[in-house]
Amino acid sequence: MDNKLKTVDAETLLSMPMSKTMFIVDGLISQGVNVISGASKIGKSWLMLWLGLQVAQGNSVWGLPTLQCDVLYLSLEDTQRRIKDRLYNLTDSAPDNLYFAVTSGLIGGGLEEQITDFLTEHPATKLVIIDTLQKVRDSKGSAGKAGMYGNDYDDISSIKRIADSFNIAILLVHHLRKLQDSDDPFNDVSGSTGIIGAADTNFILRRKRSGNAATLLVSGRDVEYQELTLQFNDLVWELVERKNSEDIHKAELPKFLFRVVDFMECRTEWVGTATELLTEMKEQEVTPNMVTKYLGQFAYEVLEPLGIEYRTKRTGKSRLIKFLRRDGDDANDTGIAI
């Protein structure tokens, strides 16, 4: 048995023809394993059924194009009667290329063979939805030597091998833990970090019990970070707003700096301390220390593109700030001194 590493040099790799990453939903759901996690009973199954219908019929998802294809939906917490009732609520013309199963084997206990057989018999299938992940895992097993992380990673990797082998997207529906991490929502996924680590894309659906609004967070290897604001209306999750990483970053920029730009609109130059700046701008909520921090972190990103040059210099016990507004050809003159 040849146990050597199979390597490829960078030059050869760059010249190798490769197809682009396949997306079932453009820019959102890509080939590979996708895990969507949310609290129980918040509408994940309604979302999955609607998504399956949209893809099977080739309809857009929140304004994004879809790759029309056959869809397999393992709705393992439902009965055929419940699925039928939901279909009646969502569509008048159910497609014949959306397939359902309410029972299946477990990972490592027949599931992989069942999915593989179906994909072989239905080669037009490009999306498989498994609702839920817990229903296809062996709950009687122990962590053993691999530990929880190892078991979680192995289970997702087993599903990923099918996705990669058949070049399809598999969407796993999962739960969030009850105790949540306010700093990183992706740490709220039930189980170990092996689940999000093995997945190609992770989705977090967060909804307040008392309302119909929710936020869908997206992070993946082939998709950029996104935050989608959704509204649950007439049993369908509708898009209210979509923000990508650039939009989110811009929203986090201090509004104070944009007020500095307005302040300099009728001035060509201003020199003074942070305290003097706040006094002239009539700022009540920003402190001198915050001014120093904002200018140090974001002046180049906010002020410079808008024609305001910023410099600072310590003189004795004070630190002077200097703004110079550049117009037209002056923008090419970088000379500014205090």
Predicted regions: what they are:
Residues D2-L5, E11, S19-K20, I24-V25, ...:
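Conserved inter-motif catalytic segment of the P-loop NTP-binding fold
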Residues S30-N34, C69:
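Pre-Walker A (Motif I) flank of P-loop NTPase domains
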Residues V35-S37, K41, S45-W46, L72-L74, ...:
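Phosphate-binding/switch region of NTP-binding enzymes
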Residues L47, L51:
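Hydrophobic positions on the alpha1 helix immediately C-terminal to the Walker A/P-loop
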Residues A56:
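Gly/Ala-rich phosphate-binding loop of Rossmann-like dinucleotide-binding domains
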Residues Q80, K84, G108-E112, Y149-S157, ...:
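Amphipathic alpha-helical transducer elements in NTP-driven molecular machines
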Residues N89-N97, S192-I196, V302-L303:
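Short, conserved catalytic or adaptor-binding loops enriched in Gly and charged residues
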Residues L230-I338:
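DNA transaction DNA-binding modules
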